[in-house]
Curated annotation (Swiss-Prot):
Belongs to the bacterial ribosomal protein bL21 family. Disulfide bonds: none annotated. Keywords: Ribonucleoprotein, Ribosomal protein, RNA-binding, rRNA-binding. Pfam families: Ribosomal_L21p. GO terms for molecular function: rRNA binding; structural constituent of ribosome. PANTHER family: 50S RIBOSOMAL PROTEIN L21, LARGE RIBOSOMAL SUBUNIT PROTEIN BL21M. Part of the 50S ribosomal subunit. Contacts protein L20. The gene is rplU. One of its GO terms (biological process) is translation. This is Large ribosomal subunit protein bL21. One of its GO terms (cellular component) is ribosome. It comes from Bacillus cereus (strain ATCC 14579 / DSM 31 / CCUG 7414 / JCM 2152 / NBRC 15305 / NCIMB 9373 / NCTC 2599 / NRRL B-3711).
Amino acid sequence: MYAIIETGGKQIKVEAGQAIYIEKLDVEAGETVTFDKVLFVGGENVKVGSPVVEGATVTAKVEKQGRAKKIIVFKYKAKKNNRKKQGHRQPYTKLVVEAINA
């Protein structure tokens, strides 16, 4: 069984036992998170939401908070001696999906 949830402005396909990386949530490691915005539940009994499946939830345990690898943003204008170098590390939350309740 799998489900498609919406979190952080993105839609993510999840299965029980799967580890996922999502946009940072304001929770501590070890806590349990419940997602109510379940858009689709697949498997033997397929349920499609409009826009969400009523009564369906996905529970996951927070494994850790972290920051992704650094990316470098470099802007310049030719012939103007105008240069800007900037780095960015996106914060994330790593979850392990425990159950899909549909």
